[in-house]
Regions:
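Low-acidity, Ser/Thr- and Arg-rich intrinsically disordered low-complexity segments
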Residues: 351-359, 363-365, 370-385, 390-393, ...
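ATP/Mg2+ or Mg2+-diphosphate-binding catalytic cores
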Residues: 300-342
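Residue-level signature of transmembrane alpha-helix interfaces in integral membrane proteins
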Residues: 60, 125-127, 250, 311-316, ...
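Walker A (P-loop) phosphate-binding motif
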Residues: 337-353, 366
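Conserved ATP-binding subdomain of kinase catalytic cores across diverse folds
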Residues: 9-206, 211-213, 218-300
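Short, surface-exposed amphipathic charged segments that create phosphate/polyanion-binding patches used
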Residues: 96-97, 348, 379
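Short, compositionally biased leader-like segments
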Residues: 1-10
Length: 397
């Protein structure tokens, strides 16, 4: 649960000041985003959640600076500066420091991106082009190749994945979430078995860990234009541990979210082009394992909304969303095992019914495994085709 004080007079005053400067306001769990025609200003909320604590002005300044630095890696022309909001002696709020003023808060100033060129919108409106996919993969592989690397031993990497998998079991099986504990436990058992029995596939990936993005979703990806390069916004700035990833896991996560929007062939193209662009491509089985793990992460994030008192009336919706991700996790860990069966006889035979047992509410989830595995022949066309889907909100700012 997010712990936040009642909005103080100072916070309310800062919000009112920013509202007067802007034409549109977006509120998230952790921030307000104030939009003008050309810019966006992000103000962190004074909230506390786990290791994340934004309850002091100094903490909010630091996380703004971190957000600026980290996001400039993939969006150097989008993240412009960190600005102080100051109060004069006569009580007037303004941007920037001047003599006799006192800092009351900090904001990240960004260039506003056109919503029509965000990946989720392009998927929804069927405007995605082949060159968009190629440019995106090229940008991401360049980022992966140049990113800071983490030194981690092969046994420790496997151990860390096992710890994460077990933590998912504990978190998702919490009784108050109301999810199918038997289904969750079976998925976890299959993921654990994969890690224990297929260490030869997993261990070498320890050499590829980078300080990555951590939240590579379609709504965070700007496809660029004739005069503007692609960018990726909104990395996980508040927890470096969550950003230490195998690039293959980042691609698997993005592909999962594209499938959620009905863009199975796009997901296939992203994975195929990434594997073709790297000197050490991950196996198909490992990509499916990472997809299963990513789906568990998304299920957990959806389920956590059930605990939020402000979202109590939407608890059934979030439970359904979590269950759909659990269904996807089950399908992909089964598929990872089938890849291995084709190469050798596995030591354990996963239950063929796991996907069905975990498919509560999954019929409405736009994820067609056969179509993803065998995309249509339109790959030679100038556009990427996939079923029309409603939605596509563009960026959060």
């Amino acid at each position: 649960m997010i712990k936040a004080p009642q909005r103080s007079g100072r916070a309310s005053e800062v919000v009112r000041f920013l509202r007067h400067q802007c034409s549109e306001v977006i509120e998230t769990h952790f921030a307000w985003i104030f939009l003008t025609d050309l810019h966006a200003y992000k103000l962190k909320k004074p909230v506390r959640r786990g290791r994340m604590d934004y309850t002091t002005i100094a903490a909010r300044k630091q996380v703004c600076l971190d957000e600026l630095t980290l996001n400039r890696r993939l969006a150097p022309t989008v993240y412009l500066e960190v600005l102080p909001i100051t109060r004069s002696r006569d009580g007037i709020l303004a941007f920037g420091r001047r003599r006799g003023t006192r800092v009351v808060d900090w904001v990240v100033k960004m260039r506003r991106l056109p919503a029509a060129r965000m990946l989720d919108r392009a998927i929804a409106e069927r405007t995605l082009r082949k060159q968009d996919v190629q440019s995106l993969v090229s940008m991401l592989t360049g980022f992966f190749d140049g990113a800071v690397r983490q030194q981690l031993s092969e046994p420790r990497y496997v151990e860390r994945l096992l710890e994460r998998t077990d933590r998912n079991r504990r978190d998702l099986c919490a009784p108050e979430l109301g999810l199918d504990a038997r289904c969750i436990s079976r998925i976890i058992e299959m993921q654990m078995a994969f890690l224990e029995e297929r260490k030869a596939l997993v261990r070498p990936r320890a050499a590829h860990l980078i300080d990555g993005h951590g939240d590579l979703r379609p709504e965070h990806i700007y496809l660029g234009s004739a005069s503007d390069s692609p960018s990726v916004i909104d990395c996980l700035e508040f927890d470096s541990e969550l950003r230490w990833v195998d690039p293959a896991e980042e691609i698997a996560f993005l592909a999962l979210e594209c499938r959620k929007l009905g863009a199975g062939p796009l997901a296939h193209a992203l994975v195929a082009q990434y594997r073709a662009s790297t000197l050490t491509p991950p196996s198909a089985a490992l990509m499916d394992f990472y997809t299963s793990q990513s789906a568990m992460t998304r299920a957990k994030l959806a389920a956590w909304h059930v605990r939020d008192p402000e979202l109590a009336r939407d608890a059934a919706l979030w439970r359904t969303r979590a269950s759909r991700y659990l269904s996807i996790a089950a399908r992909y860990i089964r598929r990872a095992s089938r890849h291995l069966e084709a190469a050798s006889t596995p030591r354990t035979q996963p239950s063929a019914s796991t996907g069905q047992r975990c498919s509560n509410g999954a019929s409405g989830f736009p994820d067609n495994i056969r179509r993803i595995a065998s995309p249509n022949s339109g790959a030679t066309e100038s556009t990427v085709s996939f079923p029309a889907q409603s939605g596509g909100s563009g960026p959060k700012w």
